[in-house]
Amino acid sequence: MKTLYSLRRFYPVETLFNGTLALAGRDQETTGFAWWAGNARLINLSGKLLGAHVAHAGLIVFWAGAMNLFEVAHFVPEKPMYEQGLILLPHLATLGWGVGPGGEVIDTFPYFVSGVLHLISSAVLGFGGIYHALLGPETLEESFPFFGYVWKDRNKMTTILGIHLILLGIGAFLLVLKALYFGGVYDTWAPGGGDVRKITNLTLSPSVIFGYLLKSPFGGEGWIVSVDDLEDIIGGHVWLGSICILGGIWHILTKPFAWARRAFVWSGEAYLSYSLGALSVFGFIACCFVWFNNTAYPSEFYGPTGPEASQAQAFTFLVRDQRLGANVGSAQGPTGLGKYLMRSPTGEVIFGGETMRFWDLRAPWLEPLRGPNGLDLGRLKKDIQPWQERRSAEYMTHAPLGSLNSVGGVATEINAVNYVSPRSWLATSHFVLGFFLFVGHLWHAGRARAAAAGFEKGIDRDLEPVLSMTPLS
């Protein structure tokens, strides 16, 4: 029987289903990995691994461009974005492209340009990926030492980390530049129902920016997800970009301290596990952000948040019944609590009924009706504007609660339409991806630590049924 375990330390071998199969001259015997182990076959071939990563980037960018153009081709300007199953155009609209007052799409050409640019970029990346995978040098260390590396070289690894941090910092500053100088971004809090505007008064106070990190994640606190001010968001990106760039320079110029050399496992699989763990955290945070935050993810494009749709329902019926003569300030519901208005645990005037659980919602269509002690009865009686009524009625029937069969809306709302909110899709997908990335982090971290301890041998397959089966080909 062929050797099941590679003699190379740290590289457990998986069993081939067909021992005669060899791909591009790199079979199980020479690489220590079966064909289906993917890029693990290239773990010591920096040139080929570069090709795999560049080609992967090309696939990602190709999807972005193709899906972008698909959404542009299907876009109907008469309907809100969130009713059309769009997941990319809302991001472009949030950046201020092609939209005007109230989030109305006035020009789809910027979306078309975005799609085409991504397709062109994907072609360049695809060519580069194919070149490095098939034609370029197998290893970069000899020809291009700057781009070469050895996984155990701690100094080189932190240099690569530093380069990545600088690139992330530049990305953060691109958003800052867009918001400050290149047309601005969409602000759902702009007077009259939202508009595109340039950010002119950045929040750079560290007590404000880092105060979000110190907030409780519960109740009316909401940690960083509670941000409801574009000045804070863009100012936060200034801080984040600066920290990433300075941290990148630090990691390029310095070598790991002794405690870091001892604390971390320094191998390719360990770096993979660290990356998966970081991406998992990003996914969970993004899930919470898109589900609860209607400033970074404006409801005009992504649909209302769950609390927002619930409060909109209460507001819509308050408006209706008030027009029919109800005294919304004193009417009682079946429990004896206020039918339309009641008090929160902190004494604020809030909407009554089931939506009381969402009393800490903040939304641009509702905030003008608040006073120093919560909802202001005088404003509710005299200052409600038509745009607030229209928006709340729309949000009431478009709660982000759709199921797989596309039956959407609040269970108590008979006028809900059949649709699935992109807010639901984005929150759910990021949670699921974050979870599986976390599982991947645990898996690869365990393997990396075992290998570093010297007892990683792979899975014992001496009695595996497939070994006694006839090869497929």
From Swiss-Prot:
Q: How is the cofactor bound?
A: Binds multiple chlorophylls and provides some of the ligands for the Ca-4Mn-5O cluster of the oxygen-evolving complex. It may also provide a ligand for a Cl- that is required for oxygen evolution. PSII binds additional chlorophylls, carotenoids and specific lipids.
User: One Pfam family name from the record?
Assistant: PSII
Topology term for the membrane? Multi-pass membrane protein
Q: Which residues belong to the signal peptide in this entry?
A: none
**Which amino acid positions bind [CaMn4O5] cluster, per UniProt?**
E367
NCBIfam families, from UniProt?
A: psbC (TIGR01153)
Protein's job: One of the components of the core complex of photosystem II (PSII). It binds chlorophyll and helps catalyze the primary light-induced photochemical processes of PSII. PSII is a light-driven water:plastoquinone oxidoreductase, using light energy to abstract electrons from H(2)O, generating O(2) and a proton gradient subsequently used for ATP formation.
Subunit structure as annotated in this protein's UniProt entry: PSII is composed of 1 copy each of membrane proteins PsbA, PsbB, PsbC, PsbD, PsbE, PsbF, PsbH, PsbI, PsbJ, PsbK, PsbL, PsbM, PsbT, PsbX, PsbY, PsbZ, Psb30/Ycf12, at least 3 peripheral proteins of the oxygen-evolving complex and a large number of cofactors. It forms dimeric complexes.
- Protein name, as recorded: Photosystem II CP43 reaction center protein
Q: Which organism is it from?
A: Dioscorea elephantipes
